[in-house]
Amino acid sequence: MDGLKLRSATPFDSEFAFQTKKAAFKQYVERIWGWNEEEQRRLHLKRFSSQEFSVIQLSGVDVGIMAIVKEPDCVNINQIFILPKYQGKGIGTACVRQVVDDAATTKLSVKLQALKVNNRAIAFFQKLGFKKIGESGTHVRMERPL
């Protein structure tokens, strides 16, 4: 996709990352646990400081965030959130395809989980070749095999 770029997040991106997650994900969290702003901010800060985040940019504009963790046997997409006004434009598809392509070069599958109530995300990942491999009370685990 022309103009699409990932850049490593810095501590200065933490608030953007939180606000992006909130804009894209709050409605789903509310349906399961309710949205406690203080608790969500605490969880975000913990994850943001312990995972490698990237800021997704389109033509120089920050439009989303993504956190990828490479394990010995797979690559995990821990988070991917696109601001609502940029959803449906192929940005998430391009980002996920890049992760899948990069993982394929090292013969690794790609795994993730989505909230069960987020049917849109589940359908999105299925369209990109992900299969359900398990579930918990709240999440569906998915994998894009080699």
Predicted regions and their residues:
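A short beta-loop-alpha structural element at the N-terminal edge
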Residues: 4-19
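A short helix-loop-beta-strand connector motif used in the catalytic cores of GNAT acetyltransferases and
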Residues: 45-55, 64
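Conserved beta-strand in the GNAT
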Residues: 61-69, 76-81
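Conserved GNAT-fold acetyl-CoA-binding loop/helix
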Residues: 25-45
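Conserved acetyl-CoA-binding loop-helix of GNAT-fold acetyltransferases
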Residues: 82, 88-101, 123, 127
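Conserved beta-strand-loop-alpha-helix junction that forms the acyl-donor binding cleft
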Residues: 112-122, 138-146
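Conserved GNAT acetyl-CoA-binding A-motif
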Residues: 103-115
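Conserved active-site tyrosine of GNAT-family acetyltransferases
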Residues: 44, 125, 130
